[in-house]
Amino acid sequence: MKHLAIYPGSFDPLTNGHLDILQRSLGLFDKVIIAIAVNSNKSTLFSIEERLEFIHKVTQGLKGLEIDTFQGLTVDYCNKVGANSIIRGLRAVTDFDYEYAISLMNKKLAPNVETVFLMSSGEYSFISSTIVKEVARHGRDVSNQVPEIVGKALLKKLSQ
């Protein structure tokens, strides 16, 4: 049996922490789909097209990876594509409470889908897309927190 997992998120922007979780999950599953959530009620800095482009460029050459977008509930997307696992990265204990509650609801909605929690590597445990955007808005360097293409796009977008 093939083990297919999805790694869902808004990835606005993609960070080195996201890449850490992704690369480690590729060692655990036969295939991983990075599933970019499209939420018309949520305001994003980067368009879905920009986020797709960043992820495609940064992950070129990674085996066992697919990139897609989805709307609606994550578990519905899992069932649509035949995924049996959802990957979630945890930076700190505070992430766990939120993610655990969501995983319990997901289990009620889709008993066939498991949530797999991966702890962030220490050097990425403080990185979040929200923090990266805030630091970049104040003109500070975020080049160690995001891939180069994302860092350049952040500077350009925030200087407009």
Swiss-Prot record:
Its EC number is 2.7.7.3. Pathway: Cofactor biosynthesis; coenzyme A biosynthesis; CoA from (R)-pantothenate: step 4/5. The keyword ATP-binding applies. GO terms for biological process: coenzyme A biosynthetic process. Belongs to the bacterial CoaD family. InterPro entries: Cyt_trans-like, PPAT, Rossmann-like_a/b/a_fold. GO terms for molecular function: ATP binding; pantetheine-phosphate adenylyltransferase activity. It catalyses: (R)-4'-phosphopantetheine + ATP + H(+) = 3'-dephospho-CoA + diphosphate. ATP binds at S10, F11, H18, G89, L90, R91, E99, Y124, S125, F126, I127, S128, S129, T130. The record marks H18 as: Transition state stabilizer. Reversibly transfers an adenylyl group from ATP to 4'-phosphopantetheine, yielding dephospho-CoA (dPCoA) and pyrophosphate. Substrate binds at S10, K42, T74, R88. Homohexamer. It comes from the Bacteria. Its main location: cytoplasm. GO terms for cellular component: cytoplasm. This is Phosphopantetheine adenylyltransferase. The keyword Nucleotide-binding applies. It is found in: Cytoplasm. Keywords: ATP-binding, Coenzyme A biosynthesis, Cytoplasm, Magnesium, Nucleotide-binding, Nucleotidyltransferase, Transferase. The lineage of its organism: Bacteria, Pseudomonadati, Spirochaetota, Spirochaetia, Leptospirales. It comes from Leptospira borgpetersenii serovar Hardjo-bovis (strain JB197). Its cofactor is Mg(2+).
